[in-house]
Amino acid sequence: MLDSLRAAASTAVLPRAYFRYAASRPAALLLAGGLALAVAAPAAAQQESDGQERSASDQQEQAGVELYDAPQPSGSEDGTWTLNWENDIFGGTDRNYTNGNRLSYVSPEAGMGGLHGPIARALLFADDADRVRWGLAIGQSMYTPRNTEARRPLPDQHPYAGWAYGEYSVYAQDDDSLRMIGLQAGMVGPSARGEWVQNNVHRAIGTDESNGWDNQLEDEPAFVLMYERKERALIAGEYLGLQLDVVPHVGVALGTLRTQASAGATLRFGDDLKRDFGPPRIRPAMGGSGYFEATPSFNWYLFVGAEGRAVARNLFLDGNTWKDSASVERKPFVAELQYGLVMQYDNLQLAWTFVTRSRQFDEQERPQQFGAVSLSVKF
């Protein structure tokens, strides 16, 4: 500041004679100092203001660099799309539950508005602290007997059946629990196009066609209302970046397609396990949440799960509800074991599952084995 005053005083536009005069007059000297200060003060203020602006600009630029450098998950606020494929080719067979495809979408957190809000409050007992989502899905499943060469009915084997459906679901989640209620509705029978899909795929890959689709279950609209609850419990905290948890679950399904109660648990080992509740599957299998939290890094976990089901109705085994059709003697209890691997990077998740399902009807020779693959992406 003093340097600025001296510079301003030395350059002020005042006659030298005036300074000689001012030196002999105190009042004039005060006036000269005032004029010099008046000239110097704005210049000093301008220099100080420029310095402050440069400092603020530098801070903003540095903050911008830090924000840019900080890894941000690209799908943190997006919905989740998932494509599921399940097939017994992974078990080396072509029988019973032989193929399933499903495309699903689960929304980001959606609040308590719309149709899902009242459903979540009334049926899932959700409140404003819960994270509520809704989901839509379409899918198709196919079932065939063990002998796919025969054209005649095979009363001791799984009936031919196709199932095409749509699904609406609502989810309510807090930190460590997930509740879901959903409705599947669709068509069983020729209109589900199971024969067309299976035989065209077999022709495309050069394998034998299934010859007995004329004996499949008749067209019948069907539905099932489903409820599931899952809880996450951490067994071992983070050690070397890894965790161990267990996700027990219970469920109930009621409808013309399927009526059952189920319970089971999944054990998981890996990193950042709070990203989801397990891998997505096609029901009636024990599935995960259908969505996950995006992460800017690579994550993975191994899992093994088991479930028991008490089954009161299975249309694919019991046959058509109002028409005579093929059927088998259904077993009232079914067990399922699954294990696999889930990998995630940013907004992508890939899961592989191998499944062993116990005998579902009396004439079934052995438990069924099949594989499941799912690809999920958030956008």
Residue ranges and their predicted role:
Residues R152-D156, E209-N215, G251, K323-S327, ...:
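Extracellular loop and loop/strand-boundary signature of outer-membrane beta-barrel proteins
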Residues R95-N101, Y160-A164, R179, D219-L225, ...:
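Residues that define the transmembrane beta-barrel architecture of outer-membrane proteins
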Residues A122-W196:
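Long, hydrophobic/aromatic-enriched structural stretches that serve as scaffold segments
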Residues Y105-S107, Q140, V170-A172, R229-A233, ...:
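Residue-level signature of outer-membrane beta-barrel architecture
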Residues W81-N87, W134-M142, L183-G189, R229, ...:
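Transmembrane beta-barrel strands of outer-membrane/channel proteins
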